[in-house]
Design a protein with these regions (language model features):
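A structural feature that tracks compact, well-ordered secondary-structure segments
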Residues: 3-31, 40-44, 68-98, 102-110
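Short amphipathic alpha-helical linker/capping segments at the junctions of internal repeats
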Residues: 33-36, 56-60, 99-102
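Intrinsic disorder/low-complexity detector
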Residues: 1-10, 46-75, 119-122
Length: 123
């Protein structure tokens, strides 16, 4: 089962969503309070399972309404996804993937793991 690992960093507090194997599948922005971070986790739990995928790498792609996963190519030419909440705010983002199929698998992993993932504190 996946978990949301909450971690304090120099500039605030953030979370990583980890799959059952411990691999980070999505990360948050840095929040200035634990309460805000926990709200972000709840937003991912609520939005990930219902969010459609907007593949911005496809020619003439269909624009989806928020909440949604956006698939895009970064400056390094790698595929990434970000999960946007209903208000359009980015609530989770991925690392870069060399293959689009791997990126899409990452989205499926977030959809599967987020709803029931436990929250744990990390050093």
């Amino acid at each position: 089962m996946g978990k949301f690992a909450v971690k304090t960093v120099k500039t605030g507090i953030k979370f990583n969503l980890k799959a059952g194997n411990g691999e980070i599948i999505a990360a948050s922005e840095i929040y200035n309070s634990k309460a805000a971070c926990l709200n972000g986790i709840e937003s991912v739990r609520k939005n990930a399972p219902i969010a459609p995928v907007e593949d911005q790498t496809a020619e003439g792609f269909a624009v989806e309404k928020n909440p949604k996963f956006e698939v895009y190519v970064d400056k390094a030419g790698e595929f990434r996804f970000r999960l946007k909440a209903r208000n359009g705010e980015i609530i989770a983002a991925s690392e870069g993937y060399k293959a689009k199929a791997s990126c899409l698998n990452g989205i499926e992993s977030v959809k599967k793991n987020a709803p029931d993932a436990e929250v744990v504190e990390e050093e």
